[in-house]
Amino acid sequence: MDHRTPTPDNPWLALRNLTPARIALGRTGTSLPTGAQLDFQFAHAQARDAVHLAFDHAGLASQLSDRGRDSLVLHSAASDRHQYLQRPDLGRRLNEDSIATLRQHTQANPGGVDLAIVVADGLSALAVHRHTLPFLNRFEEQAAADGWTSAPVVLVQQGRVAVADEVGELLGARMTVMLIGERPGLSSPDSLGLYFTYAPKVGLTDAYRNCISNIRLEGLSYGMAAHRLLYLMREACRRQLSGVNLKDEAEVHSLESEGSASQKGNFLLGKG
């Protein structure tokens, strides 16, 4: 006689091919199968590692230089990772040395710019390392015809979203785009977030920002994120505002695979 606890068939199992989300995990008796439990622990470890991974700003600056882009490396008022996690307010402001660096740059390059791109580690430096350059490649390809002037790419260590407001104000930028590592999830330790602000200045709330989230190969493609950002930027320049009063109404004809532009259609329905 077989005394093993039977594992019931799981009708949701086929849906696991459509999403990295933790669905259709199955069960053994009243508990999760061993494999699902181990996968959960591994995903949790990946999320913790993403939060504490050091920002390789020197490596990113070197890659930007190889593409002909200048960069400025700055630091928030949070002195280290521990203080960054304990004091979110310090991650929203620059330290004194960084403020002085931006002021010197502005004095040497008066007149302001249309766009300041700010990159910060946030809660996942892994996301920044993986997705910043591929996204910027797609964005700059699509934005070339607009003729916007831009400042050097600003790399902020221990930075939070609002630090881009201070950067933009000091540079005299009409718009800022913040690329930042999002809080890791159990299936997405490397999601890149994007925050767009028109007329940045210190003290703005989230109501004045537009967010485009989950930029990564398994989420929103680089091309689609760039398309949505450009729509917001063009509308912001026309209407002179951003945030809750500016809705993302960019036309999206179909989902595009980053690997092949010919793969179109809704992933839930199969290939179009």
UniProtKB/Swiss-Prot annotation:
Subunit structure: The basic unit is a heterodimer which dimerizes to form tetramers. The heterotetramers trimerize; 6 large subunits form a core ring with 6 small subunits projecting outwards.
Gene behind the chain: eutC
Pfam families: EutC
Keyword Hydrolase listed: no
Subcellular location: Bacterial microcompartment
Enzyme Commission number(s): 4.3.1.7
Keyword Phosphoprotein appears in the UniProt entry: no
Pathway: Amine and polyamine degradation; ethanolamine degradation
Residues holding adenosylcob(III)alamin: V161, E182, C211
Gene Ontology MF term list: cobalamin binding; ethanolamine ammonia-lyase activity
Catalytic activity: ethanolamine = acetaldehyde + NH4(+)
Species whose genome carries this gene: Pseudomonas putida (strain GB-1)
Protein name: Ethanolamine ammonia-lyase small subunit
Sorted UniProt keywords: Bacterial microcompartment, Cobalamin, Cobalt, Lyase
InterPro entries noted in UniProt: EutC (IPR009246), EutC_C (IPR042251), EutC_N (IPR042255)
Cofactors that this protein relies on: adenosylcob(III)alamin
Note describing how the cofactor binds: Binds between the large and small subunits.
HAMAP family recorded: EutC
Gene3D superfamilies, per the entry: Ethanolamine ammonia-lyase light chain (EutC) (3.40.50.11240), Ethanolamine ammonia-lyase light chain (EutC), N-terminal domain (1.10.30.40)
Gene Ontology biological process terms in this record: amino acid metabolic process; ethanolamine catabolic process
Family of this protein: Belongs to the EutC family.
GO cellular component, one term: ethanolamine ammonia-lyase complex
Biological function: Catalyzes the deamination of various vicinal amino-alcohols to oxo compounds. Allows this organism to utilize ethanolamine as the sole source of nitrogen and carbon in the presence of external vitamin B12.
NCBIfam families recorded: PRK05465.1
